[in-house]
């Protein structure tokens, strides 16, 4: 199971009801923060999500409402005794932005590993201490360049699930019992002059979890295959009414109905709308624009928690 907590659902500027863009993914006690807008630390405190186990921060782009909370969070992590490296992922150019932001945080007592997102997937293995970049892993982070007024990327998180041990296969393949546990972890094992593969003891691959996060973009066609069959899509919906579509095009954002159409065309299971313009006092007033297209659409609220279970 994974948990996603919306820490901020506002866009442009904070309001009394909404902090700026941020969400946190929790899997097996390790955490990935997505964006870090103003108010992120306060929302973490209220929701009790904490920041000590954050291994990766994924930044969609460097507009202030998505990143201005980052220097303060980095400082708080350092002041709280963090020594472990922290990975920051973002669009091309994020490295220079991080350098600029950290001018006001001159001392960071841990390593920052900045990855300017490529078109290749990033795989991470997970253990009790951290998430580590590797050639294979339980969590795969995928990115897509979207269309906004600055370089911006959407994220998809594929959480893999290990196949079950298959006793019948292990016996049929005459795999020595002493190496069963090693093979269950994946990879090959050489034993007494013979090479054994993990596929010799494991069953079929099981369905994992797919979570997509899309913000600050026009509804480009490439989004549909990118979010295809996601268990959850969190998608920006800066404008509520269909009559605001010209504003959305001008500012390179989406309306409620455009976000819903992405969800419908992408055959996602659940849609949470976020990144509401400060001009929208109550997003629920406009939810029918989304539900008419995608009935499972919901309004995202600060500190809302969404849990997704593995199936079967």
From Swiss-Prot:
Pfam families: Lactamase_B (PF00753)
Catalytic reactions on record: Endonucleolytic cleavage of RNA, removing extra 3' nucleotides from tRNA precursor, generating 3' termini of tRNAs. A 3'-hydroxy group is left at the tRNA terminus and a 5'-phosphoryl group is left at the trailer molecule
Cofactor: binding details: Binds 2 Zn(2+) ions.
Entry superkingdom: Bacteria
Co-factor requirement: Zn(2+)
Active site residues of this protein: 65
A GO molecular-function descriptor: 3'-tRNA processing endoribonuclease activity
Binding annotation for Zn(2+) 2: 65-66, 216, 275
Alphabetical UniProt keywords: Endonuclease, Hydrolase, Metal-binding, Nuclease, tRNA processing, Zinc
Top-tier EC class: hydrolase
EC numbers for this chain: 3.1.26.11
Keyword Metal-binding assigned: yes
InterPro entries linked: Metallo-B-lactamas, RibonucZ/Hydroxyglut_hydro, RNase_Z/BN
Quaternary context: Homodimer.
Family affiliation: Belongs to the RNase Z family.
Protein task: Zinc phosphodiesterase, which displays some tRNA 3'-processing endonuclease activity. Probably involved in tRNA maturation, by removing a 3'-trailer from precursor tRNA.
Protein's UniProt name: Ribonuclease Z
